[in-house]
Design a protein with these regions (language model features):
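Acidic, low-complexity terminal tails and accessory targeting/binding regions
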Residues: 1-2, 44, 77, 85-96, ...
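Active-site-proximal alpha-helix that buttresses catalytic centers in soluble enzyme cores
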Residues: 2-72, 101, 114
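Short, solvent-exposed loop/turn segments at secondary-structure junctions
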Residues: 11-13, 59-60, 83-84, 146-149, ...
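Phosphate-handling substructures
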Residues: 28-29, 71-125, 165-166, 187
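Glycine-rich phosphate-binding loop signature in dinucleotide/nucleotide-binding domains
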Residues: 46-49, 132-138
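Short beta-strand scaffold positions
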Residues: 55-56, 123, 143-144
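Active-site signature of alpha/beta-hydrolase-fold catalytic machinery across serine-
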Residues: 67, 151-155
Length: 197
């Protein structure tokens, strides 16, 4: 990989309602507004050479990629390591309730009901980015979720993670060069090795 274009999926029906939806087996299509956002992303990418498109397992990332790359023969790879978190009992409820729990909890704590600890989520994202940077394709479009992008941007900025992060804008592109992605991986792994958050 030489460069990666990181994009949060377009607005989904559930994200428009502020719901926590991390399970891949729960359908969550784009809203009408999200479809328009994905089309606009496609217009922005129309003249950009893309050698591989990576999505998470979740429907909203795949649908965003399908619309944005319509008519283009871009190979696909589904990478579960870049899925949204598993929220446990907060799944399907207001995201704000999960965030309130996270703010009061240690980063190693698992949400009740089978959710993922934030440390485990960060480790998973680091592994996902490591797989991407090892790919032979030069330009990779990564359609994923707000959290892995937010963590990547924090890492590049040299800041520490926090339980409450601003949402990344829908269908907005962030271009990271190879060295940037390697720095992200290094920092994410360091966060997990010596968690102070």
């Amino acid at each position: 990989m030489q460069s990666a274009i990181l994009v949060r999926h377009a607005e989904s029906v559930f994200s428009a309602l502020g719901l926590a939806t991390g399970r891949a087996d729960v359908g969550c299509p784009l809203s009408d507004r999200g479809v328009a956002q994905a089309r606009a992303l496609g217009d922005e990418l129309a003249k950009k050479g893309i050698d591989l498109c990576v999505t998470s397992e979740l429907e909203r990332t795949k649908q965003t990629a399908d619309i944005a790359l319509a008519g283009r023969a871009v190979p696909r790879l589904v990478l579960a390591a870049l899925n949204d978190p598993l929220y446990g009992r907060y799944e399907g409820g207001p995201l704000a309730e999960y965030v309130a729990w996270a703010v009061e909890s240690d980063s190693a704590a698992e949400p009740p009901g089978g959710g993922e600890a934030r440390q485990a989520i960060v480790a998973r994202y680091a592994a996902g980015f490591r797989r991407i940077v090892a790919r032979p394709e030069r330009v990779i479009l990564l359609v994923t979720h707000s959290l892995p992008i937010a963590y990547a941007l924090l890492a590049l900025d040299g800041r520490e993670p926090a339980p409450r992060l601003p949402q990344v804008e829908y269908a907005k592109r962030y271009v990271l060069e190879r060295d940037d992605v390697i720095e992200v991986i290094t920092r994410l792994e360091a966060w997990c090795a010596a968690p102070t958050w």
